[in-house]
């Protein structure tokens, strides 16, 4: 079912002998979860501690909104195959390892638009990909310490899922890549669009002459200053209290809309 192992506690071991549904390890707080098959969407969503081992592929939005309390070991997600779309969205901590073996999409093991909004954590991956959010994440060279950690824990992962024969497949360090979140100082800033460039490049292009409705309109489309007066004051505020009713109020089957009912209670 859904959310197996959710809010799992430390010293808890859950082993699923087959594929599983969505949200495996949701809000996991320390449990070790082994899935002998594919996992659905939302795997390791908001996980804070613990480990999840998946002997297959995972669906969309895996490892999203994770976090890491420095007092404890970081959460870990190990995937033998590939990740689905929007992987690592708003990831704020933890370690993910995508092995890319028999991936669902062999030429893109990280899925569509991964790591959007990523602010923490790191991801090891083995295989081709089609890009990621460069504004939020960056590739770095893997140091000896990272490789030693990956190599050691890779044996543990393969042992838990019963695929130790794949150790040689993943033993080539040059085939692995490491991606980490950018610091706030490293964030790639988007250029600010001026009002003039928006007016000429977007507004006039879509709504001006030759646009979607520009040829059908005869309205005054000149720029309106911040405080308008005289003829350019296109909207004049008037007081029309209780003149119009919302659809729910007008068609209320009881004849006493909610706001009037509470008004009667107050009175």
Task: Locate each region found by the language model.
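Ferredoxin-type iron-sulfur electron-transfer modules and their immediate structural context
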Residues: 190-267
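Long, distal/terminal scaffolding or interaction modules
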Residues: 1-205
């Amino acid at each position: 079912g859904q959310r197996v192992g959710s809010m799992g506690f430390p010293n808890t071991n859950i082993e699923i002998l087959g594929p599983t549904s969505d949200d495996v390890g949701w809000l996991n707080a320390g449990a070790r979860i082994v899935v002998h098959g594919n996992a659905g969407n939302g795997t390791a969503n908001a996980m804070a501690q613990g480990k999840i081992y998946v002997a297959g592929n995972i669906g969309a939005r895996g490892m999203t909104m994770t976090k890491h309390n420095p007092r404890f070991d970081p959460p870990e997600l190990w995937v033998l195959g590939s990740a689905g779309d929007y992987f690592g969205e708003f990831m704020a901590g933890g370690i993910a390892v995508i092995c890319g073996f028999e991936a669902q999409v062999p030429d893109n093991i990280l899925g569509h638009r991964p790591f959007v909004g990523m602010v923490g954590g790191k991801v090891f991956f083995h295989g081709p990909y089609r890009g990621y959010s460069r504004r939020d994440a960056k590739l770095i060279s893997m140091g000896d310490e990272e490789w030693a950690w990956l190599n050691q824990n890779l044996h543990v992962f393969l042992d838990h899922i019963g695929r130790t024969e794949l150790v040689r497949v993943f033993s080539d360090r040059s085939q692995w890549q490491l991606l980490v979140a950018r610091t706030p100082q490293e964030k790639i800033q988007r250029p600010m669009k001026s009002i003039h460039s928006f007016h000429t490049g977007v507004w006039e292009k879509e709504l001006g002459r030759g646009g979607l409705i520009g040829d059908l309109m005869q309205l005054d489309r000149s720029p309106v200053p911040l405080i308008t007066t005289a003829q350019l004051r296109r909207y004049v505020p008037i007081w029309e209290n209780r003149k119009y009713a919302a659809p729910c109020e007008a068609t209320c089957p009881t004849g006493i809309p909610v706001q009037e009912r509470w008004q009667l209670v107050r009175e």
